[in-house]
Amino acid sequence: MLRRVAVAAVFATGRKLRCEAGRDVTAVGRIEARGLCEESAKPFPTLTMPGRNKAKSTCSCPDLQPNGQDLGESGRVARLGADESEEEGRSLSNVGDPEIIKSPSDPKQYRYIKLQNGLQALLISDLSNVEGKTGNATDEEEEEEEEEEEGEEEEEEEEDDDDDDDEDSGAEIQDDDEEGFDDEEEFDDDEHDDDDLDNEENELEELEERVEARKKTTEKQSAAALCVGVGSFADPDDLPGLAHFLEHMVFMGSLKYPDENGFDAFLKKHGGSDNASTDCERTVFQFDVQRKYFKEALDRWAQFFIHPLMIRDAIDREVEAVDSEYQLARPSDANRKEMLFGSLARPGHPMGKFFWGNAETLKHEPKKNNIDTHARLREFWMRYYSAHYMTLVVQSKETLDTLEKWVTEIFSQIPNNGLPKPNFSHLTDPFDTPAFNKLYRVVPIRKIHALTITWALPPQQQHYRVKPLHYISWLVGHEGKGSILSYLRKKCWALALFGGNGETGFEQNSTYSVFSISITLTDEGYEHFYEVAHTVFQYLKMLQKLGPEKRVFEEIQKIEDNEFHYQEQTDPVEYVENMCENMQLYPRQDFLTGDQLLFEYKPEVIAEALNQLVPQKANLVLLSGANEGRCDLKEKWFGTQYSIEDIENSWTELWKSNFDLNSDLHLPAENKYIATDFTLKAFDCPETEYPAKIVNTPQGCLWYKKDNKFKIPKAYIRFHLISPLIQKSAANVVLFDIFVNILTHNLAEPAYEADVAQLEYKLVAGEHGLIIRVKGFNHKLPLLFQLIIDYLTEFSSTPAVFTMITEQLKKTYFNILIKPETLAKDVRLLILEYSRWSMIDKYRALMDGLSLESLLNFVKDFKSQLFVEGLVQGNVTSTESMDFLRYVVDKLNFVPLEREMPVQFQVVELPSGHHLCKVRALNKGDANSEVTVYYQSGTRSLREYTLMELLVMHMEEPCFDFLRTKQTLGYHVYPTCRNTSGILGFSVTVGTQATKYNSETVDKKIEEFLSSFEEKIENLTEDAFNTQVTALIKLKECEDTHLGEEVDRNWNEVVTQQYLFDRLAHEIEALKSFSKSDLVSWFKAHRGPGSKMLSVHVVGYGKYELEEDGAPVCEDPNSREGMQLIYLPPSPLLAESTTPITDIRAFTATLSLFPYHKIVK
């Protein structure tokens, strides 16, 4: 599956493609300017994948703490045991490596070893508790666990799945009313965006990513990651995509564990997950699992690299998974731009290769040319999956000696072929060609105007201690006074800007490093794109003339020093993935710090990079729908339409000259938001286990909890400003979106200093109110919060800004609607949630025209009558917390709501039977279809919700195995536990292609799977059932890795007004009471006579969905620019067994409504 971090050409198996909503990937060296639809501005837009959460930290860190004691062994070969006495062994068994530098706030212990076969490993003992005290498991505890393991029957045929974060194959435990249509939640990297069109659905959807399966005082998951120092650059010319394909194939059984889906099944049975990804020069595999099963999981996983089967029978089926991944990627503008950029490399450079692979390159062409793909796979594995290219990281609550023993026993079996690692460093200057310094006009899939300016520099990895590109990007991406973006925003030419290098394989490898600046343009900005480029060049020239500034460098150091010193712990599986890649790039002492810290100020190194950023070496790419009709070229693999033009002569001549600087552009002033007080505050009220309501008035209430667990000088402030005004009409919902986006725009410049000082804020246009989220070092956090409330109180907009934002919002709505997965979600929720305004409703309201006057009247009315609900947690006293609510109430001076307002929709009760809503996808160039089969349950208890979670957990692995592995229906295949505004249900979703399957064939296959699953759970043994229950209990007991996870869980209760802060404890108690018969009975009841079943099909364009077979039966009459639902009739496959829905409003108007319901009992 494509691991997309910035522009990295990377892939992953799809076993854990959840795009990790809410995990903010900020690569080192990239400063991200916030604003409307900013995903389009990214140099190479980002898709967040597990473990790519690289901190933006940079510091000199004079007080970094070495880890452990000096053993007197540097780079030692792993030892199998020790002869110390029992007492000595216990004291020395967790001694860390003194050369590895770590943060003072990191309680973990580290040890580096190198096996006899050349594999390098980093062992991480996570025995420490959050106070930083280390405690070893007793011998009795370890023996007891071992006895339990030995006594447990491992019945592979009974193994079932957990509810991890998977989107393509994972059980997705998320609330439907918490599902968003915002770009950041989607599968392709075009839309990873924290601030564009945020709404409450996304706010809660982000929370659900982390809310499930977290509880304090219990142990974390164990995790491991292995990086092979070879990637797609090594693809043979006659088999494009082979490295990516091999990454898929090694999962398909091994000599020791031959079951094709055996590893996934084992993990799902024991609460784990796995993933893999392929980059240009690296391939990464990672998994996590309950600690009790970590050693066995390591042994099973290691067989990928010891003796994978890669049987011939599996090849054709897995090629289809790779091809589906490619088809899903084709409508992504980021992927298209990347392939186009790679094609500019000089002939013979690996950047010109097709890294993805598809059915054509891996199946049809090889057969035509008599190439044995199976034999070539094995050759590739033998040549490149060699131990001495590998770096391994394992993390668990075991002693370092225990981990060393396991790693040595298991991973020493990986073969070492003794051959030198592939080296591409001689292929420098791949873009030093006449074709590079040109203007490329590109026709995008989405509605967007964007300008990307790119330079290809010599490789910068060797300068990691200075990080010159990070220094430059910090200035280029600044949004304060004197910045590029501040100037362009004042001209109403740009909405967002991103500049830098993400340090991924595509942006930085052994042959070059990229520095890119991407700018989201307004309509007017598109007309002046040369002037926009000139502004960028003027700013860079100013930096070049000034030279590196030590003040700026030291400010970045101070900011990042604070963040590193007080860093919060991350999820183990993310952490080990990041570390195994770091081991490929940095010396031992910098494994933990190399990607985060600035160690040395060397102005000559910064100047060398900065002086190369000149117009004569720049590549310009202009994305716009306005380019259609003038682009006569087509890129081979993604079909991107583009043209190549010389840069206009007048601009070329100007940029060759000593052009004038712009007096409006200058360096940022000193930052007043940098924290200097890190004192941990004393309690001023009794300590509580859960948030307590400390203020309750007609105008609002406040929940508060002082942190006494993580003990870091940070705080989280969240407020929900609730108003009944928003949902009164589609126009109001749109006005609210405009309001929040203009408010964000207005705050961009004054709040940016706080943002770069690690004080983060986010404004969310919720379904029922404005959500304000602020977090960071508590010292200066009140300043930022007050700034936001001040700007909210004094809200204003110029006509130019109003026009700019509304035009961009039209593009944003359009871009959401043309994606099958988001349209499918919109259609499903439009059917289920009464009085919901669909995205098409909002698009039409916007196209009908709204005025600035109507916006200002709406905002005035919105602010006049509210109910404010807040949560404050962290290093803050109760008195200080009450001041936050008081500031909101005093500044806004609103009256209370007349009556209590529900923060959820009412849901329609589906009739019995099978209903089908089949609509056309809105992008005629997209073959992708989305099929969801949903079963409605109704108003259920917390016990039944938990039972449904258990059901979906059981369902996940066999669903993946049947629908993806065996039937090869698509890449994204997953069952989901649905909580739609308090009404329960479950669904199975498959993303497929109209070039391969009819959507109704897929629907029938889903039904076939569910029938077989019923038989499977009926035959489930009690032991297998109990093992799955235990796995889910362990997930729910999994401790929070940092304060933010605890806050997310509590905020989810506040923002949904459920307030069941000990929900996990209740769910665990419910799980302990379940029997196998409960599960079977519940499933049969929802699948038997009287079941309420809804199928939603969004149908792509391809030979299996021909127009003549699906002529529209009804078109929504209120069309705007073709944005309408086109309903299709069922084909003979489903015509007799389903009732078609050909008008959603007419269908739901006849249905009863469930009462408002909360799952709290």
Curated annotation (Swiss-Prot):
Cellular localization per UniProt: Mitochondrion; Cell projection, Dendrite
Assigned GO CC terms: dendrite; mitochondrial matrix
Domain of life: Eukaryota
UniProt record, GO biological process: negative regulation of cold-induced thermogenesis; positive regulation of axonogenesis; positive regulation of membrane protein ectodomain proteolysis; positive regulation of myelination; proteolysis
Record-listed Phosphoserine modification sites: 85, 91, 93
Primary localization: mitochondrion
UniProt-annotated binding residues for Zn(2+): 244, 248, 325
Tissue: Testis, and in a lower level in brain, heart and adrenal glands.
Gene3D superfamilies (UniProt xref): Metalloenzyme, LuxS/M16 peptidase-like (3.30.830.10)
Record note on cofactor: Binds 1 zinc ion per subunit.
Subunit organization: Interacts with BACE1 and NRG1.
Name this polypeptide is given: Nardilysin
